[in-house]
Curated annotation (Swiss-Prot):
It comes from Staphylococcus carnosus (strain TM300). Mg(2+) binds at residues 9, 384. Keywords: ATP-binding, Cytoplasm, Kinase, Magnesium, Metal-binding, Nucleotide-binding, Transferase. One of its GO terms (biological process) is acetate metabolic process. This is Acetate kinase. It holds the Pfam family Acetate_kinase. Mg(2+). Can also accept Mn(2+). One of its GO terms (cellular component) is cytoplasm. The active site is at 147 (proton donor/acceptor). Belongs to the acetokinase family. NCBIfam families: ackA. ATP binds at residues 16, 207-211, 282-284, 330-334.
Length: 398
């Protein structure tokens, strides 16, 4: 029997949704409500190749959910709210409390709230979405799906920082990792494509968008990942620095007179590709600029690829080899140039990739390795919403 599930991503002033039929994993409708609580609130709903837009004042998430449900009914996408069997909600941080998705109860809500200091920008907004749906659709299961859960299988030696141990015990300071729902989806999909049990595969998953993270997945479990206590750690990103020497923070403060908060802002919003190039955080712009001979754009691309290279090499060593390299997310799926830069020179570890196949894949699924390559290289468009919907069915006992 099929279930209709809403996959929800609630922001502080926005609400993204997809209505998905499970187990067929068919997208029935998707939409976005923007500027909740602000002037110029807007709703967009897409279904059957059509697009509906409307503008009206939307004061809070409860009203936003009400309007969304009304539109789904008015547009004939569902007959009434009883057609919806469950909801799944993206929650950014589950800390160590949630090693897997969870059916939302009052206690689970409190636990998510208790993790606010680990994700002050995201968890409160995610929780607003959960509470709105629980209020308006009380008779169905609501499931929280955490970005961090997939990485809770990392061993201690991977997640602990070399700090006094009591900082971990007292304050929860450790590597958590992010993009877990995406890494989980593409690794499972890779096993499906290859027709092999995931338990037999060593996978390096490269989620490369404006934010980027690399994950080492051994036997279907995350054993390491590049992001850390926050999404600032790891590889160079669009505007985030990735890994730096921590002593640079007080040094920059001393040299510039800026506060720790201001320096952190620079590391999050003015660094990465934008910081090095001085022009853009968008890889498409930088590829164009590099073609035109702009040296700093070229340098930004070289640094970007070099950092990803480093993680791929270290994760191959960690797993004593690799069977599959996956590229996913906006850049990983669409930029053959970035993929080429990252794959260049990896023949020593059994990666033989086909430039022709690589240049033909943009946003579609497929192999870019030569048939004889011991390591398979696959482009897989991520689908976090489907993963959220699957977990809504599983943990909601639908």
């Amino acid at each position: 029997m099929s279930n209709l599930v809403l996959a929800i991503n609630a922001g502080s002033s926005s609400l993204k949704f997809q209505l998905i039929e499970i187990p067929e994993e068919k997208l029935v409708s998707k939409g976005l409500i923007e500027r909740i609580g602000l002037k110029g609130s807007k709703i967009t709903v897409e279904y059957d190749g059509r697009k509906f837009t409307d503008e009206k004042e939307i004061n809070d998430h409860v009203q936003a959910v009400n309007i969304m449900l009304d539109n789904l009914i008015d547009l004939g996408i569902i007959r009434d709210i009883n057609d919806i069997d469950g909801t799944g909600h993206r929650v950014v941080h589950g800390g160590e409390l949630f090693p897997e998705s969870a059916l939302v109860t009052n206690n689970v809500e409190k636990q998510i709230e208790s993790l606010t200091e680990l994700a002050p920008l995201h968890n409160p907004a995610n929780l607003m979405g959960i509470r709105a749906f629980r209020k308006l659709l009380p008779g169905i299961p609501h499931v929280a799906v955490f970005d961090t859960s997939f990485h809770q299988t990392m061993p201690e030696q991977a997640y602990l920082y070399s700090l006094p141990f009591h900082y971990y015990k007292d304050y929860g300071i450790r590597k958590y990792g992010f993009h877990g729902t995406s890494h989980k989806y593409v690794s499972q999909r890779a096993a499906e494509i290859l027709g092999k049990p995931i338990e037999e595969l060593r996978i390096i998953s490269c989620h490369i968008g404006n934010g980027a993270s690399i994950a080492a997945i051994d036997g279907g479990e995350s054993v390491d990942t590049s992001m850390g206590f926050t999404p600032l750690a790891g590889v160079t990103m669009g505007t985030r620095s990735g890994d730096i020497d921590p002593a640079l923070i007080p040094y920059i403060m001393e040299k510039t007179g800026k506060s720790a908060e201001a320096v952190l802002d620079i590391l999050n919003k003015e660094s990465g590709l934008l910081g090095i190039s001085g022009t853009s955080s968008d890889l498409r712009d930088l590829e164009q600029d590099a073609e035109e001979g702009k040296t700093r754009a070229q340098l930004a691309l070289d640094v970007f690829a070099s950092r990803i290279h480093k993680y791929i090499g270290s994760y191959a060593a960690k797993m004593h080899g690799v069977d599959v390299v996956i590229f996913t997310a906006g850049v990983g799926e669409n930029s053959d140039e970035v993929r080429a830069r990252v794959l260049e020179g990896l023949e020593f570890m059994g990666v033989y990739w086909d430039p022709k196949k690589n240049s033909q894949l943009h946003g579609t699924e497929g192999f870019i390795n030569y048939p004889h390559s011991p390591v398979k290289v696959i482009v897989i468009p991520t689908n976090e919403e489907v993963m959220i919907a699957r977990d809504a069915v599983k943990f909601g006992s639908l």
